[in-house]
Regions:
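Helix-to-loop junction immediately C-terminal to a conserved catalytic motif
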Residues: 50
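Conserved ABC transporter NBD signature motif
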Residues: 58-73
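Conserved ABC ATPase signature
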Residues: 145-149, 153
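A short, proline-enriched helix->beta-strand linker immediately N-terminal to the Walker B motif
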Residues: 164-168
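Catalytic Walker B motif of ABC-type/P-loop ATPase nucleotide-binding domains
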Residues: 170-173
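ABC ATPase "signature
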Residues: 229-230
Length: 259
C-alpha cells in the first residue's frame, strides 16, 4: 500500500530551479534513503513533501488523500486548511538541528502537541511519552531541558517527539549532520530499530554505509534531478550512472561503504 506520493514536482527560487519534475512513491513499511551532494535538492524535496515549502507545480498524496494537485493552469493548488491539518498528522519530521522547544522539559516537548493539537487525554499521552523516553534510552531525563542534554540526547528527544504524534511515517533531514562523530552511532541505532519495527521512513543522509544497510531503496539526486534509484546494493555498491560513481568515490577508502 502506498503511504506517500509526490508527483512531477517543480520548485524554483527566483530564476534557480531546484527540483525538476521529481516523482517519488513510498510504500507502507518501506525505508527510502535520499543521497546526493549539497545543493542537489534533497532537503528541498523533503520540505515540499512535508509542506514546509510550497511547490510550483506537482501533486502530493498521503494515504490516497490529495494534499496538493495541479490546477488548470498547471500550478499547485493545496487542499483546504482543515484537510491539510488532518493530512499533516500522517507524518512526523525530524530536523538536523533538533528544533526542540528550549523552554520545555523533555516530557513537555513530547506531550505538548498530542494534548493541545490532537486533543488527547493527558494521562494516556504521558504514559506513551514515558514509554518513548524509555525506548530512546533517556530514563531519568524527563524533567531535563534541551540545553542540559548532549546533541545525541536532544536528537533522540526530537525523534521521540515525532513518534508521540503516532504518525504513519517519518521524514528525517540529515539527522546526524549536527552531531559529533561519536554521537552519530546512537542516532543511527535508533533509526535502525525503527526500521526493524517497519516504520515507514524517508531519510536524507550522508551516511552511505547506513543507507546501504538499512534502506530498502536509495535515491541519488544531483542538480534537482533523480539520477539513479534502486536497491542499495545496486545504487551504492554497484552504481550504473557515471555521476553516481563520481559522488560515491568520495566515500571510498573511508570505510563508509565497505565497512
Amino acid at each position: 500500500m502506498s503511504l506517500f506520493e509526490i508527483n512531477n514536482v517543480r520548485k524554483s527560487f527566483g530564476d534557480l530551479t531546484v527540483l525538476h519534475d521529481i516523482s517519488v512513491k513510498v510504500d507502507e513499511g518501506e525505508v527510502v534513503a535520499i543521497i546526493g551532494p549539497s545543493g542537489s535538492g534533497k532537503s528541498t524535496l523533503l520540505r515540499c513533501a512535508t509542506m514546509l515549502e510550497t511547490m510550483d507545480s506537482g501533486e502530493l498524496i498521503y494515504l490516497d488523500e490529495k494534499a496538493a494537485h495541479n490546477d488548470p493552469a498547471g500550478h499547485t493548488a493545496y487542499a483546504s486548511p482543515a484537510d491539510l491539518r488532518r493530512i499533516k498528522g500522517y507524518f512526523g519530521l525530524v530536523f538536523q538541528n533538533f528544533n526542540l522547544f528550549p523552554h520545555f522539559s523533555v516530557m513537555r516537548n513530547l506531550t505538548e502537541a498530542p494534548i493541545h493539537v490532537q486533543k488527547r487525554e493527558r494521562g494516556e499521552v504521558e504514559k506513551e511519552a514515558r514509554e518513548l523516553i524509555r525506548k530512546m534510552g533517556l530514563e531519568g531525563k524527563e524533567n531535563y531541558y534541551p540545553q542540559q542534554l548532549s546533541g545525541g540526547q536532544q536528537q533522540r528527544v526530537a525523534i521521540a517527539r515525532a513518534l508521540a504524534m503516532n504518525p504513519k511515517m517519518l521524514f528525517f533531514d540529515e539527522p546526524t549532520s549536527a552531531l559529533d562523530p561519536e554521537l552519530t552511532g546512537e542516532i543511527l541505532k535508533v533509526i535502525r530499530q525503527l526500521a526493524q519495527e517497519k516504520m515507514t521512513m524517508v531519510i536524507v543522509t550522508h551516511e552511505m554505509g547506513f543507507a546501504r544497510d538499512v534502506a530498502d531503496r536509495v535515491i541519488f539526486m544531483d542538480g534537482g534531478y533523480i539520477v539513479e534509484e534502486g536497491r542499495p546494493e545496486d545504487v551504492i555498491s554497484n552504481p550504473s550512472e557515471e555521476r553516481t560513481k563520481q559522488f560515491l568515490a568520495r566515500f571510498s577508502g573511508q570505510g563508509a561503504i565497505n565497512e
